[in-house]
Amino acid sequence: MKKQLLAALIGGSLLAPMAASAADYVIDREGAHASITFKVSHLGYSYVVGRFNDFSGDFSYDAKNPTAAKVNVKVNTLSVDSNHAERDKHIRSGDFLNTAKFAEATFVSTSVEDKGNGDMVITGNFTLNGVTKPLAIQAHAVGEGQDPWGGYRAGFTGTTTFAMKDYGIKMDLGPASANVELDLVVEGVRK
């Protein structure tokens, strides 16, 4: 009995630091240290580039155990900004984002694959235009550490591509413009 109790205490004390080492972060939107940008081919000749100005989210991350990471992001699709007011109005319409009906896009991670050297694949459920489908983000841990204000930060980049038709966007701009590339820059402040 004493041996079992001792083994349980030792085992528990060894596992406790591992369980406590994952940290929760909130995406730093106030300091403008995060961005969600997109790029779509314009007829195969150039690109339309834009961003979402309003989004929020949080994540849990432990550099020693990246596969346990969790990510949750909400994007206000009304905040789309392609640097052209008339185009933004069209992007918000039923032809594309249908923001009158679906004013929010979300990403909730379901798994993280550690690729080594800070690289990972974050897979999750992406909801856009009322459609939810799995989406994989190629991500990289940029770094983490103390900031000058007494907080602790962790930063990441990510990229992914999806087909508009997969999310019920039926506007046909031709094959060169069928996909959207998303680029993500995320800096989180430890809660």
Swiss-Prot record:
Any one Pfam family match given in the protein's UniProt record, by short name: YceI
Statement: the UniProt record of this protein carries the keyword Lyase: no
Cited InterPro entries: Lipid/polyisoprenoid-bd_YceI (IPR007372), TTHA0802/YceI-like_sf (IPR036761), UPF0312/YceI (IPR023480)
Record's keyword annotation contains Signal: yes
SMART domains given in the database record: YceI
Gene Ontology cellular component annotations, sorted alphabetically: periplasmic space
SUPFAM superfamilies with a match to the protein in the record: YceI-like
Major location (coarse): periplasm
Protein location: Periplasm
Protein keywords: Periplasm, Signal
Stretch forming the signal peptide: 1-22
NCBIfam families, sorted: PRK03757.1
Record family assignment: Belongs to the UPF0312 family. Type 1 subfamily.
Stated name of the protein: UPF0312 protein Shewana3_1179
